[in-house]
C-alpha cells in the first residue's frame, strides 16, 4: 500500500518540474499575503473551550485503524462551539412552518435559517463551470503530457427587441429603492434589523447601523436616480427623510466609535458612505422643509471636519490608513461640491464651517512631508476639490468674500518654505505654485463683469454708462481685496523677516510664474499693486529698516525682471501701451484680436470658466481706461462707444476656432495684451528706483540694486546702452565700496560690453581692494583680445602693465605673464605661418609704441618689465628663454622695417606720429643689456640722421646709436668716421635733449676709433667761444645778454664736461691755461654765470647746468661754491630758478635710483618695482657714496621745498610736489617733516593735486600711522591757511577737506574716534578760544566750520558732544559782542575787531542751523539730554550726509557784503537784527 498519493509514479516529479518554469501567482496570492503582513490578526471564532486545540492523545496514534469515523472517547468529548455570525438576530418566528419541521435545531441555527431565502431550483447545478481566463502554459519538458483546455465559448450579447425610455428606467430605479426600503423600514419598528446584509447590530444589541452592502446599494440607486431628473418629483419625501435619519444616526454612531478607537467594524467607511447618501439626497433638489433639517447637513460635515482634522495623526501612525481616508474623503467632498455648486444659497453658519474645513485641508502642513507618490496624488485630489469648493462659495456668496480671504490669509504660516514640487500645485508643464496662491488667484478672478455683460443686447448709451459704472465698482472691490492681501503679506513678512520672509518670497515667485499665462489674467493686477507698495517703501520721507528695504528690493527686482520678459516676449511693439492706443486708435482692433486668440486658448484650458470671463473683461478695462484719458472729447467718446458695442456683441458670438496652441505658442500673443496693463507701465519707475539706489550710502541696497540690474542685463544686453543706465553705471564705477564696484564690473561682463566701457572699467585698475584689481585685470585681458583698435589695446595694456607694481604677488605675476604671452610669446606661436608671425609681431609693436606715449611713468614700467622680467633668464625656463630671444629678434627686425616704411612713404600726421612712437620703442629695446639691434640695423637707420625734421625721431635714433655703440664693436672705420662727422657737425643745431644723447655718442665713437682728436677740437672750440662771455661776466656781469649763442655754448660745454673724460693736455686744449679736469673748468665757468647781476635767464641756464655737472660728479655738491649758489637761489632767488634746480635734482635722484635698481634687480626675481626699491634700500644704500649726498641736499633745502609746494601758482607748485613725492618714496628725508604739508595739499582746489597728495598721505599712513595722527593738528591748520590763501574769495566752496582726511584716516573704529578728537581739539583750541586774533582767523574759522559740517559720526553721542561744544562757544561769542557794542557805538572799539567777532559768531550760528536741519535736531532737544542718556546715544547711528548736500549759507554770515571785515555798515546791519535785550 502506498504511503502517499502518487507513490511509485513520476507524477510528483512532473509537477515540480512543470511548476519550476511557471509563475506562482495563481498558487500564492501575493497581494493577500502582503496585506496580511500589516493587518492585525483577528480570531473570527471565539472558543469557550480549548478542547479543539488540545494535543492528540497518544493512544489515538496507536489505534489500529487510523481512518475511522468513530473517534475515541466520543462520549466524553465536548462539542465545538462557534461564534454567532455578524448581524444574525435571535428574534426568529416560532410559527415558521419551515423551521418547525426541523426539530432538535438550536436557537442560532433556527435564526440563521429564518433569515435565509430559499434557493431557486434552477440555480442548483451538478457542477460549476468557471469563466475565469485561463493562462496558456508553454511546454517546458518534452515528456510532460498536458491536456489543452477547451476553447472558451464566445458569448454574444442578445439584442433585446424592447428599449426602455429614461422615464421607465427611472421608475425601475424607484422600485429598486422601494425594495431596499423594505429592509431599512419606514421607521424603527418596521426595519429588518435581523437582516445582517443590511444592518449591523452592535454589541449592546440595541444599536443598529447600516451595513456596507446596504450603503453600496443606496449609492447605486441614488446615482441612477440622479441621472434621470424627470423622476425626482415621484420620490416620496418621507422615504427620503427616513433614509437621511438612518444615515445621520449611522454617522453619529460611527463617529462615536471612531473617537473611542473601536475597530470591530469599518466605521470610517460606513460613515463616509452614509455621508455620501445624505449629499445624494440633497442633490435631488427637494425643497421640502422636512429635508432641510440642520442635523442632516451638520452631522456629515461634523464627521468630515473630524476626519480632516485627524489626517495628520493618522499619517503619523503610518500604514495605508491615511491614504484610504483621503480617497474616501475626496469621493465624499466631490459629491458635496456638486451640491454647493447647484445650491443657490447657503446658511452663513454653514459657510463659516465649510470655509474653516476647506482652508485647513488646503493649507495643511503635514502633507509637506509626504514622500509616497500615491499619497501625494490623494492629497492633491483632496486639496483640489477643496479649492474648487472655496471658489464656488466665493462666487455664490459675495458678502462672505472678505471673510474667505481673511481665513486664507490666517494660514500664511503654513506656506512651504521651499519650492519643492511635492509641496506645491502643478499648473502646467514644469510649472508649480503654492496652493495659497492658486486659490487666491482663482477666487480673485471671480470678480468680473462677464455675466453682467452677457445679459446686455445692443445696449444704449445709458446702459453703457451703467456698464462702465458697474465695471468701476467691480474693479474697486478687486483692487481693495488685492491691496488687503498684499498688505497682510507684507505686514507678516516685515514683522519678523528672518521667520516669515519665505511667505513674501513664495508669493512673489508664484505671481511672477503665472503672470505670462492666460489662465491667470488677474496676476498682472496683483503684481502691479504689489510693485507699487514695494516702491513706496523707498520713499525718502519714510525710511524703513535696511532689512525691510533689502527684502523689498529683492521682490522689486524679480517683478521688474518679469516685466522685461513680457516686453521682450511680446510680438508687438514694446511701447504699445494705453498712450500708444490713444494716439493710434486703429491698433485697438489688433489688441482685441490678440485677446480673442487668448480666449480661444482658455476654452481649451482645464480651468477655463473663470479665467475666460476675467480675461474677456480685461478688454472692457482697456476701453474704460482709454475713455478716462479724454472724457470731454465727444469724438473720442464716439469712437470708443462703437468699440464697446462691438465688444458686447462679441460675447454672444462663437469664438473662431484657433489652432491648438500650447503655453509656449500663446506666450507672445498674451504678452502683447499685457503691454496695456498698469504693471508694464511701472517699468520706468522701477528702473529709476534701481538706478537711484545705486547712489545710496547703504552697501546692502547698492548690492541689491546691482542684482536687479544684473537680472535685466542678463535678459537684454542692450540695457547697458540705455543712456540713464549707462550714465549710472559709469558713475557707480567710482563707488567707494569694493563689493559694489565688483558687482558693477560683473554687470558689464554680463552685458559683454567690455570695449564700450573700457575707460570706466579702468578707473578702478588701482583700487584698494584686491578683488576689484583682479577683476579689472581679468577684464582688461579680455578687452585686449577682443578689440582690434590699437589705441584701446594700448590703453588696457598700460593698465595691465601698471599692475607689475601691485602689492599682491598673484596680481603681479598675472600681469607680467599675460603681457609676455600677448606681446612676445604670441609672435612665434606653434605651427604659425611666417605671415601670421609678422602680423602678430606688428600688432605688438604698434600697441607697445602707442603705450609708450603715456608718459615717463609708463616708459619706466615697460623698461622695468622688459629688463627685469622678460630678459631675466632666472624667471623662465630654458625653452621659454629661447622663444623670447627669437621673438625679440623678429620684433626688432620688424621695428626697423616699420620705421623705414614710415619714413620712405608719404604718410599723414597720424602715421608720422606712429613712426616716432615705434622709434621710441626701438630706443627702449636698445637699452637692454642683451641688445637685439645688429650692425645691419644701425646701418639701415643711418640715412635718417641727416633729416632736418624737427621731431623726436632723431632723438630716438641718437638713443639707439648711443646704447648700441656701448655694446657692439668692430664697426668699419669709414662708417665710424662718417657717423662721427655727422654727429659733430650737427651738434650746434641740436636741442638740449639731443645733446644729452649726441655728445656721449660722439665720445663712444671716438673710443671705437681710438682717436678723440675731433671731439677734443669740438670741445676746445666751444670753450674758446665761451671765453669772451666769461670775461664780460667777470668785468661787467650786467652786460651779459641772454643771446641764443651763449645759451647753446653753455649747454655744449656742460655736455662735454658731463659725458667726455678728456685728458686736458696742451696738445688737445692749447688755448686753456689750466690743466685741471675739463668738468672742473666748466664748473668754474658756470659759477661765473650764476652771479647776482647776470641776467636771470642766463643765471637759470647756468644754475641748471651746474646741477647737471654736479649730478655727474656728485663730489661737486660738497663744494662750497656750488652750495653757495644753491643756498642763494633758495633763499632769495627767483622761483623759476628754484624750480629748475628741483627738476635737475629730480633727474639726479631718478638716475641714482635707476642705477641702484639695475645693480640689484637684473638677475633677481623680485616681484615689483616697489619691492625692488626696498631691497635697494636695505642692501646698497650704505655702499653708495651718492646716497648720503642726496639725503644731505634734501635736508638742506626741505623747508624751502615745502613752502614752494604751497604756493598759489599750482603749475609751479606741481614741480615741488612731484619732487616731494620722490624724496618720500626714496626715503631721503624724515617723513614727519613732510606730513603737515602733505595734509595741507589735500585742501587744494586742483583735483589732480588733491589726488596726488591723497595718494602720498595714504602711503605715509601705511608706514607711519601714529606719526600721521601726531601731525594732523598742524596739517589741518596749515591746510586751512593754504585754502584761504589760494582762493581768498571762494575758499568756502570747498567743504570736503576734513571729510577727505577722515575717509583716509578712519581705517578702523579707534582711528575714527581719534580723528574726531584731534579735529575737535584743533577747531576749539586753536581757533575758537579766547586767545585767538579773530581779525586774522575769522575766515579760517568759516572754512573749518564749512568742512566740519560734512564729517561723519559713528553715533549720536559724538554728534551731540560736538554740538554742545559749539553751543557753548556760541554763547561765549554772544557775550563778547555784547561787551563791545557800547564801545563800538561810542567809537571806542574799532570796526575791524567787532566785525571779525560778528563774522565768527554768525558762522557758528549758521553751522548750528545747518547741523540741526540736516540731523533733525534742535537746541531744545540737546538741553533735555544729560549724562544718563549717553549710553542710548552711543548705540544710535548717524546717517552720513550726501556729498551733494549743500553746506553753510554765506549770505547768513556776510549779510550781503562781499568783505565784511572792518566794515562799519556790516556791523550796524548786524546790530539792527538784534533784540533789544541782546544789545
Swiss-Prot record:
Main localization, broad class: nucleus
Residue ranges of HEAT repeats: 681-718, 720-757, 792-829, 1117-1154, 1229-1266
Disulfide bonds: none
Domain of life of the native organism: Eukaryota
Function, as annotated: Plays a structural role in chromatin. Probably involved in sister chromatid cohesion, possibly by interacting with the cohesin complex.
PANTHER family xrefs: NIPPED-B-LIKE PROTEIN, NIPPED-B-LIKE PROTEIN DELANGIN SCC2-RELATED
Record-given protein name: Sister chromatid cohesion protein 2
Species for this entry: Eremothecium gossypii (strain ATCC 10895 / CBS 109.51 / FGSC 9923 / NRRL Y-1056)
Gene from which the chain derives: SCC2
Amino acid at each position: 500500500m502506498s504511503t502517499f498519493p502518487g507513490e511509485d509514479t513520476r507524477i510528483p516529479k512532473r509537477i515540480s518540474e512543470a511548476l519550476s518554469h511557471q509563475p506562482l501567482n495563481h498558487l500564492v496570492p501575493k497581494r493577500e499575503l502582503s496585506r496580511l503582513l500589516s493587518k492585525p490578526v483577528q480570531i473570527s471564532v471565539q472558543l469557550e473551550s480549548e478542547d479543539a486545540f488540545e494535543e492528540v492523545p497518544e493512544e489515538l496514534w496507536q489505534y489500529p485503524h487510523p481512518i475511522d469515523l468513530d473517534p475515541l472517547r466520543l462520549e466524553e468529548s465536548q462539542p465545538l462551539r462557534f461564534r454567532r455570525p455578524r448581524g444574525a438576530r435571535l428574534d426568529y418566528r416560532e410559527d415558521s412552518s419551515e423551521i418547525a419541521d426541523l426539530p432538535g435545531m438550536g436557537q442560532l441555527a433556527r435564526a440563521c435559517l429564518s433569515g435565509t431565502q430559499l434557493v431557486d431550483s434552477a440555480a442548483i447545478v451538478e457542477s460549476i463551470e468557471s469563466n475565469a481566463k485561463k493562462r496558456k502554459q508553454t511546454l517546458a519538458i518534452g515528456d510532460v503530457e498536458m491536456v489543452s483546455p477547451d476553447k472558451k465559448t464566445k458569448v454574444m450579447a442578445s439584442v433585446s427587441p424592447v428599449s426602455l425610455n429614461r422615464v421607465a428606467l427611472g421608475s425601475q430605479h424607484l422600485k429598486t429603492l422601494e425594495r431596499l426600503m423594505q429592509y431599512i423600514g419606514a421607521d424603527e419598528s418596521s426595519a429588518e434589523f435581523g437582516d445582517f446584509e443590511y444592518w449591523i447590530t452592535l454589541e449592546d444589541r440595541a444599536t443598529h447601523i447600516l451595513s456596507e452592502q446596504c450603503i453600496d446599494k443606496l449609492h447605486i440607486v441614488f446615482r441612477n436616480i440622479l441621472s434621470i431628473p424627470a423622476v425626482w418629483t415621484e420620490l416620496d419625501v418621507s422615504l427620503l427623510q427616513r433614509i437621511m435619519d438612518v444615515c445621520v444616526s449611522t454617522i453619529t454612531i460611527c463617529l462615536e466609535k471612531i473617537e473611542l478607537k473601536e475597530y470591530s467594524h469599518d466605521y470610517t467607511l460606513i460613515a463616509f458612505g452614509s455621508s455620501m447618501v445624505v449629499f445624494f439626497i440633497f442633490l435631488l433638489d427637494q425643497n421640502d422643509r422636512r429635508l432641510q433639517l440642520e442635523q442632516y447637513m451638520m452631522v456629515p460635515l461634523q464627521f468630515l471636519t473630524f476626519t480632516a482634522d485627524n489626517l495628520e495623526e493618522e499619517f503619523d501612525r503610518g500604514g495605508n490608513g491615511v491614504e484610504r481616508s483621503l480617497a474616501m474623503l475626496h469621493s465624499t467632498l466631490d459629491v458635496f461640491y456638486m451640491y454647493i455648486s447647484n445650491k443657490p444659497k447657503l446658511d452663513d453658519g454653514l459657510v463659516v464651517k465649510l470655509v474653516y474645513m476647506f482652508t485647513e485641508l488646503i493649507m495643511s502642513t503635514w502633507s509637506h512631508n509626504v514622500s509616497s507618490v500615491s499619497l501625494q496624488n490623494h492629497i492633491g485630489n483632496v486639496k483640489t476639490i477643496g479649492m474648487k469648493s472655496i471658489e464656488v462659495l466665493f462666487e455664490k456668496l459675495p458678502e462672505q468674500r472678505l471673510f474667505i480671504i481673511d481665513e486664507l490669509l490666517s494660514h500664511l504660516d503654513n506656506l512651504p518654505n521651499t519650492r519643492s514640487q511635492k509641496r506645491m500645485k502643478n499648473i502646467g508643464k514644469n510649472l508649480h505654485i503654492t496652493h495659497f496662491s492658486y486659490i487666491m488667484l482663482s477666487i480673485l478672478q471671480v470678480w468680473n463683469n462677464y455675466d453682467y455683460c452677457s445679459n446686455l443686447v445692443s445696449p444704449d448709451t445709458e446702459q453703457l454708462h451703467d456698464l462702465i459704472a458697474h465695471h468701476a465698482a467691480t474693479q474697486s472691490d478687486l483692487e481693495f481685496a488685492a491691496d488687503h492681501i498684499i498688505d497682510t503679506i507684507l505686514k507678516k513678512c516685515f514683522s519678523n523677516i528672518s521667520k516669515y520672509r519665505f511667505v513674501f518670497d513664495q508669493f512673489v515667485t508664484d505671481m511672477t510664474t503665472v503672470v505670462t499665462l492666460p489662465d491667470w489674467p488677474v496676476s498682472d493686477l496683483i503684481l502691479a499693486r504689489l510693485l507699487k507698495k514695494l516702491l513706496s517703501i523707498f520713499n525718502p520721507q519714510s525710511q524703513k529698516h535696511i532689512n525691510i528695504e533689502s527684502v523689498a528690493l529683492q521682490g522689486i527686482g524679480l517683478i521688474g525682471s518679469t516685466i522685461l520678459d513680457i516686453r521682450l516676449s511680446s510680438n508687438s511693439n514694446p511701447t504699445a501701451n494705453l498712450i500708444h492706443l490713444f494716439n493710434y486708435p486703429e491698433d485697438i482692433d489688433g489688441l482685441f484680436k490678440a485677446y480673442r486668440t487668448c480666449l480661444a486658448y482658455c476654452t481649451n484650458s482645464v480651468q477655463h470658466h473663470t479665467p475666460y470671463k476675467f480675461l474677456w473683461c480685461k478688454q472692457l478695462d482697456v476701453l474704460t481706461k482709454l475713455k478716462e484719458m479724454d472724457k470731454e472729447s465727444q469724438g473720442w467718446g464716439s469712437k470708443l462707444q462703437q468699440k464697446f458695442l462691438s465688444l458686447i456683441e462679441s460675447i454672444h458670438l462663437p469664438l473662431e476656432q484657433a489652432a491648438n496652441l500650447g503655453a509656449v505658442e500663446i506666450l507672445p500673443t498674451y504678452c502683447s495684451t499685457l503691454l496695456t496693463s498698469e504693471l508694464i507701465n511701472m517699468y520706468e519707475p522701477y528702473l529709476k528706483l534701481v538706478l537711484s539706489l545705486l547712489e545710496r550710502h547703504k552697501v546692502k541696497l547698492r548690492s541689491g540694486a546691482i542684482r536687479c540690474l544684473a537680472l535685466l542685463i542678463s535678459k537684454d544686453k542692450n540695457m547697458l546702452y540705455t543712456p540713464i543706465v549707462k550714465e549710472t553705471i559709469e558713475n557707480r564705477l567710482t563707488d567707494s565700496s569694493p563689493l559694489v564696484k565688483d558687482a558693477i564690473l560683473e554687470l558689464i561682463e554680463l552685458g559683454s560690453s567690455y570695449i564700450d566701457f573700457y575707460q570706466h572699467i579702468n578707473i578702478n585698475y588701482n583700487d584698494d581692494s584686491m578683488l576689484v584689481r583682479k577683476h579689472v585685470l581679468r577684464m582688461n585681458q579680455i578687452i585686449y583680445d577682443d578689440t582690434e583698435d590699437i589705441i584701446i589695446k594700448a590703453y588696457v595694456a598700460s593698465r595691465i602693465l601698471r599692475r607689475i607694481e601691485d602689492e599682491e604677488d598673484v596680481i603681479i605675476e598675472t600681469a607680467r605673464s599675460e603681457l609676455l604671452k600677448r606681446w612676445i610669446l604670441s609672435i612665434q606661436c606653434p605651427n604659425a605661418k611666417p605671415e601670421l608671425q609678422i602680423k602678430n609681431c606688428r600688432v605688438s609693436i604698434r600697441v607697445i609704441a602707442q603705450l609708450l606715449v603715456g608718459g615717463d611713468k609708463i616708459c619706466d614700467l615697460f623698461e622695468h618689465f622688459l629688463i627685469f622680467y622678460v630678459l631675466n633668464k632666472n624667471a623662465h625656463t630654458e625653452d621659454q628663454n629661447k622663444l623670447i630671444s627669437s621673438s625679440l629678434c623678429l620684433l626688432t627686425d620688424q621695428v626697423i622695417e616699420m620705421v623705414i616704411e614710415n619714413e620712405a612713404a608719404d604718410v599723414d600726421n597720424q602715421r608720422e606720429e606712429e613712426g616716432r612712437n615705434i622709434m621710441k620703442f626701438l630706443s627702449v629695446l636698445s637699452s637692454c643689456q642683451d641688445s637685439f639691434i645688429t650692425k645691419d640695423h644701425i646701418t639701415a637707420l643711418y640715412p635718417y640722421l641727416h633729416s632736418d625734421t624737427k621731431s623726436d625721431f632723431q632723438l630716438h635714433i641718437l638713443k639707439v646709436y648711443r646704447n648700441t655703440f656701448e655694446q657692439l664693436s668692430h664697426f668699419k672705420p669709414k662708417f665710424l668716421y662718417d657717423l662721427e662727422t655727422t654727429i659733430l657737425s650737427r651738434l650746434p643745431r641740436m636741442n638740449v635733449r639731443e645733446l644729452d644723447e649726441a655728445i656721449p655718442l660722439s665720445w663712444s665713437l671716438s673710443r671705437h676709433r681710438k682717436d678723440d682728436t675731433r671731439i677734443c677740437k669740438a670741445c676746445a672750440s666751444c670753450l674758446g667761444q665761451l671765453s669772451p662771455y666769461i670775461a664780460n661776466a667777470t668785468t661787467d656781469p650786467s652786460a651779459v645778454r641772454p643771446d641764443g649763442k651763449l645759451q647753446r655754448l653753455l649747454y655744449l660745454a656742460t655736455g662735454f664736461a658731463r659725458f667726455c673724460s678728456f685728458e686736458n693736455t696742451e696738445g688737445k686744449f692749447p688755448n686753456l691755461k689750466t690743466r685741471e679736469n675739463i668738468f672742473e673748468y666748466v664748473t668754474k665757468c658756470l659759477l661765473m654765470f650764476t652771479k647776482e647781476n647776470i641776467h636771470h635767464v642766463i643765471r637759470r641756464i647756468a644754475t641748471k647746468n651746474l646741477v647737471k655737472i654736479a649730478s655727474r660728479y656728485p663730489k661737486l655738491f660738497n663744494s662750497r661754491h656750488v652750495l653757495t649758489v644753491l643756498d642763494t637761489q633758495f633763499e632769495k632767488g627767483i622761483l623759476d630758478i628754484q624750480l629748475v634746480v628741483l627738476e635737475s635734482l629730480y633727474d639726479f635722484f631718478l638716475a641714482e635710483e635707476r642705477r641702484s635698481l639695475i645693480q640689484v634687480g637684473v638677475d633677481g626675481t623680485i616681484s615689483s618695482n616697489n619691492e625692488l626699491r626696498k631691497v635697494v634700500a636695505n642692501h646698497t644704500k650704505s655702499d653708495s657714496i651718492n646716497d648720503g649726498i642726496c639725503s644731505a641736499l634734501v635736508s638742506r633745502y626741505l623747508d624751502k621745498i615745502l613752502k614752494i609746494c604751497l604756493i598759489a601758482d599750482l603749475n609751479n607748485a606741481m614741480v615741488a610736489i612731484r619732487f616731494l613725492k620722490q624724496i618720500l618714496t626714496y626715503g631721503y628725508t624724515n617723513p614727519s617733516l613732510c606730513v603737515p604739508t602733505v595734509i595741507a595739499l589735500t585742501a587744494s582746489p586742483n583735483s589732480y593735486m588733491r589726488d596726488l597728495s591723497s595718494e602720498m598721505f595714504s602711503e605715509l599712513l601705511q608706514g607711519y600711522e601714529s606719526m600721521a595722527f601726531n601731525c594732523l593738528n598742524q596739517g589741518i591748520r596749515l591746510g586751512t591757511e593754504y585754502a584761504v590763501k589760494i582762493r581768498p574769495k571762494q575758499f568756502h566752496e570747498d567743504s570736503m577737506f576734513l571729510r577727505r582726511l577722515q575717509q583716509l584716516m578712519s581705517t578702523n573704529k579707534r582711528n575714527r574716534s581719534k580723528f574726531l578728537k584731534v579735529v575737535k581739539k584743533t577747531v576749539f583750541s586753536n581757533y575758537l578760544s579766547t586767545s585767538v586774533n579773530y581779525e586774522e582767523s575769522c575766515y579760517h574759522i568759516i572754512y573749518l566750520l564749512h568742512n566740519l559740517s560734512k564729517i561723519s559720526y559713528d553715533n549720536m553721542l559724538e554728534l551731540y558732544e560736538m554740538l554742545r561744544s559749539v553751543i557753548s562757544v556760541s554763547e561765549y561769542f554772544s557775550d563778547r559782542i555784547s561787551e563791545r557794542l557800547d564801545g563800538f557805538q561810542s567809537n571806542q572799539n574799532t570796526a575791524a575787531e567787532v566785525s571779525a567777532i560778528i563774522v565768527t559768531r554768525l558762522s557758528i550760528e549758521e553751522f548750528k542751523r545747518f547741523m540741526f536741519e540736516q540731523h533733525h535736531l534742535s537746541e531744545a532737544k540737546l538741553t533735555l539730554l544729560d549724562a544718563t542718556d549717553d549710553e542710548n546715544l552711543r548705540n544710535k547711528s548717524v546717517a552720513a550726509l550726501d556729498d551733494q548736500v549743500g553746506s553753510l549759507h554765506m549770505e547768513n554770515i556776510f549779510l550781503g557784503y562781499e568783505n565784511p571785515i572792518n566794515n562799519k555798515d556790516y556791523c550796524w546791519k548786524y546790530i539792527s537784527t538784534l533784540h533789544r535785550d541782546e544789545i
